[in-house]
UniProtKB/Swiss-Prot annotation:
<dbReference type="GO" id="GO:0008013">
    <property type="term" value="F:beta-catenin binding"/>
</dbReference>
<feature type="modified residue" description="Phosphoserine">
    <location>
        <position position="770"/>
    </location>
</feature>
<keyword id="KW-0106">Calcium</keyword>
<feature type="modified residue" description="Phosphotyrosine; by SRC">
    <location>
        <position position="753"/>
    </location>
</feature>
<feature type="site" description="Cleavage; by caspase-3">
    <location>
        <begin position="750"/>
        <end position="751"/>
    </location>
</feature>
<dbReference type="GO" id="GO:0010468">
    <property type="term" value="P:regulation of gene expression"/>
</dbReference>
<dbReference type="GO" id="GO:0005912">
    <property type="term" value="C:adherens junction"/>
</dbReference>
<feature type="modified residue" description="Phosphotyrosine; by SRC">
    <location>
        <position position="755"/>
    </location>
</feature>
<keyword id="KW-1015">Disulfide bond</keyword>
<feature type="modified residue" description="Phosphoserine">
    <location>
        <position position="793"/>
    </location>
</feature>
<feature type="domain" description="Cadherin 1">
    <location>
        <begin position="154"/>
        <end position="262"/>
    </location>
</feature>
<dbReference type="InterPro" id="IPR000233">
    <property type="entry name" value="Cadherin_Y-type_LIR"/>
</dbReference>
<feature type="glycosylation site" description="O-linked (Man...) threonine">
    <location>
        <position position="576"/>
    </location>
</feature>
<feature type="modified residue" description="Phosphoserine">
    <location>
        <position position="838"/>
    </location>
</feature>
<dbReference type="GO" id="GO:0030054">
    <property type="term" value="C:cell junction"/>
</dbReference>
<dbReference type="GO" id="GO:0016477">
    <property type="term" value="P:cell migration"/>
</dbReference>
<comment type="function">
    <text>E-Cad/CTF2 promotes non-amyloidogenic degradation of Abeta precursors. Has a strong inhibitory effect on APP C99 and C83 production.</text>
</comment>
Length: 882
């Protein structure tokens, strides 16, 4: 056969295999693949999410996915056309029909009819065959491949195969038969893979190799695995696959084999007594491991089968059948009558019609303040001595039917007619009794009897309107002997401190509060620390027995002298009252100024002045400013100056060099009112310089020599003794010759002076940052002529900061940047450290030539500098002869 013949044969084969290549494609017409669809379901109860089948809608190429709408809201059509159950459905008739709508690109509504048929063994487009057991079983056929570009009327959707759990058998039990259309052409062998087929435990699902019957070999448990996914395979006798693997989903349908279980055996809650109907108390919860999505086997319904006690009504509580919330059904909860209710709660599946279990709910009725406290008895009598506070008068008792030790039981007592707040009632937390006490002392002379009205309530307010219980308390005041009362309790009297002795200062008396008792009062002084006062015991007149002194710091504080006076009556027993007498002593200028200190040491050489403070115990204006003067010839050797403007201190210093030893200085001080006083200061002159640190008193060595000399020369001549004395006086006078303050001018020439010893200083903070006009980031460009320029990254320099405290960091960081600069030394180049403007031109090194002329070494100008530079001029000046 020639090449043209082979080409023609191949073309015919291609046309025979692919007819769409040999004719023009049909035009696209939007619409459903069929006018109606029929899907068969295995039973009347359809669980939620069950796949029923698939409808197809051709919207032509390029159009978006179609949106389907079912006129029966119990079913849902997904965008891929798969029809599922939206919520559990029960088919009352063997057949159910509804419409599914879709819209084309022109918004034209298109519809198709969907019919559901109830059949035990079905498939909507497969024939039925008898199973080996003689029952009619579903047959699944491998889907064939699609050919051409024409619109397909229907797509293959394999609905899940349902298998009830807990089946009794006999096993193996046939589920479905797998068929291949290639059985007419060749012998086909079938196999399955997937869960429990070829994975452990192997063999739960098997398939007959030649007939394609899919079987289950044992009962299934939905609570363990609810869905199995298997793949069926078809191969020819030579082992070649003739069909694509087909997915088979086996859904284990639930059986009501588990009863609900409560989360607790006993539920506990509380409710307030008097709660209104509808008040929620608690919620009980039960669970069921059966299928709660597709069946009612886990739909739990709650009930209350029993109540204990069944009073005052047999149904005091109700429970929501679906949620398990227990609430109050009727009024009548009373803690005092029935404090606790025990309920039997039942939970049953199938919405309360199936398997059931029970639990216990215990409801405690909480107390509310629905019972008012009552006095028992309602009349009380008590007595209390006068003037005593916090004294118990009587005990009040109440009864309360509410729960003890709760706010609804705890009593609160109130005295209704006690406007002056003279009484209080304290509640005992254990017995709830109230103790009536006096809040402050009562006065028998003012009132002998009180009639009180006491009301009682609770800490918690009443839940309902209740009458308030009251009691009547009669309180008798007992008269006692009261102490006399000084009027006023504290008396202040102002007298001068030079008040005469024996004169009456004041009269300080007390009154007798017991008006019904005619008693006599006597007075005496209880405390008089300075023994300055005396009192008339009958009249209470106080007079002086000694001179008063305001400056007595041991007894007088802030010019006030305090004395305590007591008054005693003749009652039985006697009572004593106390009064305080405050004597304010007016100042009198009876004290002269006194210097402090009065003893001091001076150095003989370069003595330091001493500060003398002036003290005056009197008060202004009897004090500063003071006047000071030296008396009795003290001004010859000493001077005084005022140290401050107020003239309250002096500066004492010697006029000349004094002899070693003790000196007496008479200092006269005068206050502002011309009160003067002369004080002698003891001054010792020490053998030291400047400030006295360790004063060594001079030993009279020379004077000591006179006595031994006189004793040694018993037979000497008086003239020889006088001569020796004259010689000693001459030697002493030479020793005390004053040295000049400054050495002669010639002696200072060879002294060495250190002028650079300035001691420690502080860091200079007074500088202007603006003077740093150019930082490293703005330094002038440096051109190098000795090295070839290279392309290198220029280091980044930190700009000059505005904060002066950052100058140190600024210098350190830029120094590090300069050290890492690759263009920096050791290369020879011009380095610019800081540009400060143009400067004066400096001479070059070549200009520093060695001079051979005498003019270059002219040092004659040194002669003008005086004698101290004469030697320097002689050394370097030279003459023409040199």
């Amino acid at each position: 056969m020639g090449p043209w013949s082979r080409s023609l044969s191949a073309l015919c084969c291609c046309c025979r295999c692919n007819p769409w290549l040999c004719r023009e494609p049909e035009p696209c017409i939007p619409g459903f693949g069929a006018e109606s669809y029929t899907f068969t379901v295995p039973r009347r109860n359809l669980e939620r999410g069950r796949v029923l089948g698939r409808v197809s809608f051709e919207g032509c190429a390029g159009l978006p996915r179609t949106v389907y709408v079912s006129d029966d809201t119990r079913f849902k059509v997904h965008t891929d056309g798969v029809l599922t159950v939206r919520r559990p459905v029960h088919l009352h008739r063997p057949e159910l029909s509804f419409l599914v709508h879709a819209w084309d690109s022109t918004h034209r509504k298109l519809s198709t009819k969907v019919t559901l048929e109830v059949s035990a063994h079905h498939h909507h487009h497969h024939s039925h065959h008898d199973s080996p057991s003689g029952t009619q079983t579903e047959v699944l056929t491998f889907p064939g491949p699609h050919h051409g570009l024409r619109r397909q009327k229907r797509d293959w959707v394999i609905p899940p195969i349902s298998c009830p759990e807990n089946e009794k058998g006999p096993f193996p039990k046939s589920l479905v038969q797998i068929k291949s259309n290639k059985e007419k052409e060749t012998q086909v062998f079938y196999s399955i893979t997937g869960q429990r087929a070829d994975t452990p435990p192997v063999g739960v699902f098997i398939i007959e190799r030649e007939t394609g019957w899919l079987k289950v070999t044992q009962p299934l448990d939905r609570e363990q695995i609810a869905k199995y996914i298997l793949f069926s395979h078809a191969v020819s006798s030579n082992g070649q696959a003739i069909e694509e693997p087909m997915e088979i989903v086996i859904t284990v349908t639930d059986q009501n084999d588990n009863k609900p279980q409560f989360t607790q055996e006993v539920f506990k809650a509380s409710a307030l007594e008097g709660a209104l109907p509808g008040t929620s108390v608690m919620q009980v919860t039960a669970t069921d491991i059966d299928d709660e999505v597709n069946t009612y086997t886990a739909a739990i319904g709650y009930t209350i089968p029993a109540q204990d006690p069944m009073l005052p009504h047999n149904k005091m509580f109700t429970i929501n059948k679906e949620t398990g919330v227990i609430s109050v059904l009727t009024t009548g909860l009373d803690r005092e009558s029935f404090p606790t209710y025990t309920l039997m709660v039942q939970a049953a599946d199938l919405n309360g019609e199936g398997l059931s279990t029970t639990a216990t709910a215990v409801i405690t009725v909480l107390d509310t303040n629905d019972n008012a406290p009552r006095f028992n008895p309602t009349t009380y009598v008590g007595s209390v001595p006068e003037n005593e506070a916090n004294v118990a008068i009587t005990t009040l008792t109440v009864t309360d039917a509410d729960d003890p030790n709760t706010p609804a039981w705890e009593a609160v007592y109130t005295v209704l007619n006690d406007n002056e707040k003279q009484f209080i009632v304290v509640t005992d937390p254990v017995t709830n009794e109230g103790t009536l006490k006096t809040a402050k002392g009562l006065d028998f002379e003012a009132k002998q009897q009180y009639i009180l009205y006491v009301a009682v309530t609770n800490v918690a307010p009443f839940e309902v309107t209740l009458p308030t219980s009251t009691a009547t308390v009669t309180v008798d005041v007992i008269d006692v002997n009261e102490a006399p009362i000084f009027v006023p309790p504290q008396k202040r009297v102002e007298v001068p401190e030079d008040f005469g002795v024996g004169l009456e200062i004041t009269s300080y008396t007390a009154r007798e509060p017991d008006t019904f008792m005619e008693q006599k009062i006597t007075y005496r002084i209880w405390r008089d620390t300075a023994n300055w006062l005396e009192i008339n015991p009958e009249t209470g007149a106080i007079s002086t027995r000694a001179e008063l002194d305001r400056e007595d710091v041991d007894h007088v504080k802030n010019s006030t002298y305090t004395a305590l006076i007591i008054a005693t009556d003749n009652g039985s027993p006697p009572a004593t009252g106390t009064g305080t007498l405050l004597l304010f002593l007016d100042d009198v200028n009876d004290n002269g100024p006194v210097p402090e200190p009065r003893t001091m040491d001076f150095c003989q050489r370069n003595p330091e002045p001493h500060i003398i403070n002036i003290n005056d115990p009197d008060l202004p204006p009897n004090t500063s400013p003071f006047t000071a003067e030296l008396t009795h010839g003290a001004s010859v050797n000493w001077t005084i100056e005022y140290n401050d403007q107020e003239r309250e201190s002096l500066i004492l210093k010697p006029k000349k060099t004094l002899e070693l030893g003790d000196h007496k200085i008479n200092l006269k001080l005068i206050d502002n009112q011309n009160k003067d006083q002369v004080t002698t200061l003891d001054v010792h002159v020490c053998d030291c310089d400047g400030i006295v640190s360790n004063c060594r008193k001079a030993r009279p060595a020379e004077a000591g020599l006179q006595v031994p000399a006189i004793l040694g020369i018993l037979g000497g001549i008086l003239a020889f003794l006088i001569l020796i004395l004259l010689l000693l006086l001459l030697v002493r006078r030479r020793r005390v010759v004053k040295e000049p303050l400054l050495p002669p001018e010639d002696d200072t020439r060879d002294n060495v002076y250190y002028y650079d010893e300035e001691g420690g200083g502080e860091e200079d903070q007074d500088f202007d940052l603006s003077q740093l006009h150019r930082g490293l980031d703005a330094r002038p460009e440096v051109t190098r002529n000795d090295v070839a320029p290279t392309l290198m990254s220029v280091p980044q320099y930190r700009p000059r900061p505005a904060n002066p405290d950052e100058i140190g960091n600024f210098i350190d960081e830029n120094l590090k940047a300069a050290d890492s600069d690759p263009t920096a030394p050791p290369y020879d180049s011009l380095l610019v450290f800081d540009y400060e403007g143009s400067g004066s031109e400096a001479a070059t090194l070549s200009s520093l030539n060695s001079s051979e002329s005498d003019q270059d070494q002219d040092y004659d100008y040194l002669n003008e500098w005086g004698n101290r530079f004469k030697k320097l001029a002689d050394m370097y000046g030279g003459g023409e002869d040199d």
